[in-house]
A protein has these predicted regions:
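Serine-esterase "nucleophile elbow" of acetyl-processing enzymes
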Residues: 2-52, 59-68
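Alpha-helical cap/lid subdomain in secreted, periplasmic
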Residues: 33-38, 57-188
Length: 188
């Protein structure tokens, strides 16, 4: 965790392996690269590899209590999708996380998540629609899924074909930074 002077804006990133620097040193992950680019902002990485929305929801209250972030970035849902969890349960968990963040005074950003096409068009569409519906219902910014530009480039992916590699991290940082910067500016 990075500590900044009192009064500095703070951002909590609640994510899964895509934000937890899976398969590399944490210092090489996009969240640390973002810290390096935004030194006046306290960026707390509450991401855990393998995390589902249910796990994130369980951990969020204590993270909000200890961090009191100005901005909450929710990058969860991928593991729910890969496990074929119900879009209804996904929506319920994400709804509660958004409401928790907002009731604690945080500006919430929701990262869109998509599942691979082999899960079938109906499930894929229902799953993805959850993110769009929640962004509309709760008036939160929906950050387009960064993996749509990373995953098609084999040289940016780890051998498992699921996780972005170290070379992808600066690209993810540049994808996420404008959204987070704007939210921090508007939270002041």
């Amino acid at each position: 965790m990075l500590h900044n002077p009192a009064g500095a804006a703070s951002v909590l990133i609640l994510g899964d392996s895509l934000s937890a620097a899976y398969g590399m040193q944490e210092s090489k992950g996009w969240v640390q690269l973002l810290r390096d680019e935004m030194p006046s902002v306290e960026i707390i990485n509450g991401s855990v590899s393998g995390e589902t929305t249910a796990g994130g929801l369980r951990r969020l209250p204590s993270l909000l209590d200890s961090a009191t972030p100005d901005v909450l970035v929710i990058e969860l849902g991928g593991n729910d999708g890969l496990r074929g969890f119900s879009p209804k349960q996904l929506k319920s968990n994400l709804t509660k996380m958004i409401e928790l963040g907002q009731s604690n005074g945080a500006t919430v950003l929701l990262t869109e998540i998509m599942v691979p096409p082999n899960y079938g068009p109906r499930y894929s569409q229902m799953f993805n629609q959850v993110f769009h519906d929640l962004a509309d219902d709760y008036d939160v910014a929906l950050i387009p899924f960064f993996m749509t530009v990373i995953a098609p480039q084999a040289d940016l992916m780890q051998r498992d074909g699921i996780h972005p590699n170290e070379a992808a991290q600066p690209k993810i940082t540049q994808w996420m930074k404008p959204w987070i910067s704007e939210a921090v500016t508007n939270a002041d």
